[in-house]
UniProtKB/Swiss-Prot annotation:
Native source species: Caenorhabditis elegans
Annotated positions binding S-adenosyl-L-methionine: K114, G115, R116, Y159, N186, H187
Gene: set-1
Biased composition (Low complexity): 30-43
Region (Disordered): 1-61
BP GO annotations: embryo development ending in birth or egg hatching; methylation; regulation of DNA damage response, signal transduction by p53 class mediator; regulation of transcription by RNA polymerase II
Enzyme Commission number(s): 2.1.1.361
Name by which UniProt lists this protein: Histone-lysine N-methyltransferase set-1
SET domain: residues covered: 104-226
Length: 242
């Protein structure tokens, strides 16, 4: 399943700030959603008993008809199967995305140049789910009509994220102010530490941002908006040099 996405950048980009979505089909295929489960294993070495023969050569100790449990205590394994681990990870990701749990791990700050941005208050490992890009999900045709309406008002910034999923074009419109922090993450093509993915949860698709690498506490979160059209670059050169 191929997914492509871009976040629209326009000349009316909001003054206080300054995507190709990675392929993903559903939660089952999400790439290392988070470090949600681990397991440990223990193993023992079994040394077979030696056959003993008397000097007369007539006595042989034969253990072939005995149960191994007579000699070794059976220990219950605490190891989980790979399916159990995968199911637990998927369930944890589902809850985290739907409940917006990670919002509390991020903070809004103001930069003198870019305006508002988002920093992390905790460390993230490569592949961890960080935050969802939340807004109003709509089909491409509807989004283009709304985009045209926005273009008539220079006071409205661009928070529309266009992407393709299952061979169909969609858009998430996060223009309206909200408490969701994903909409305030700034752009960087030179040093992004996040990437976008589309996952399906309970029949609905969600655009999420995951760590491209280890991210340290206090770092600003950044991802590549992905818009490379000539018109957009001409109006917003910072898209290719930040």
């Amino acid at each position: 399943m191929k997914v492509a996405a871009k976040k629209l950048a326009t000349s009316r980009m909001r003054k206080d700030r300054a995507a190709a979505a990675s392929p993903s089909s559903d939660i089952e295929n999400s790439e290392n959603p988070s470090s949600l489960a681990s397991h440990s294993s223990s193993s023992g070495r079994m040394t077979p008993s030696k056959n003993t023969r008397s000097r007369k050569g007539v006595s042989v100790k034969d253990v072939s008809n005995h149960k191994i449990t007579e000699f070794f205590q059976v220990r219950r394994s605490n190891r989980k199967t790979s399916k159990q681990i995968s199911d637990e990870a998927k369930h944890a990701l589902r809850d985290t995305v739907l409940k917006g749990t990670n919002e509390r791990l991020l903070e809004v700050y103001k930069d003198v140049v870019k305006g508002r941005g988002i920093r992390t208050k905790v460390n993230f490992e490569k592949g961890d789910f960080v935050v969802e890009y939340r807004g109003v999900m709509m089909e491409y045709s509807e989004a283009k009509v709304i985009e045209e309406q926005y273009s008539n008002d220079e006071e409205i910034g661009s928070y529309m994220y266009f992407f393709e999923h299952n061979n169909k074009k969609w858009c998430i419109d996060a223009t309206k102010e909200s408490p969701w922090k994903g909409r305030l993450i700034n752009h960087s093509v030179l040093r992004p530490n996040l990437k976008t993915k589309v996952v399906e949860i309970d029949g609905s698709h969600h655009l999420i941002l995951v760590a491209r690498r280890q991210i340290a506490q206090g770092e600003e979160l950044l991802y590549d908006y992905g818009d490379r059209s000539a018109e957009t670059i001409a109006k917003n050169p910072w898209l290719v040099n930040t």
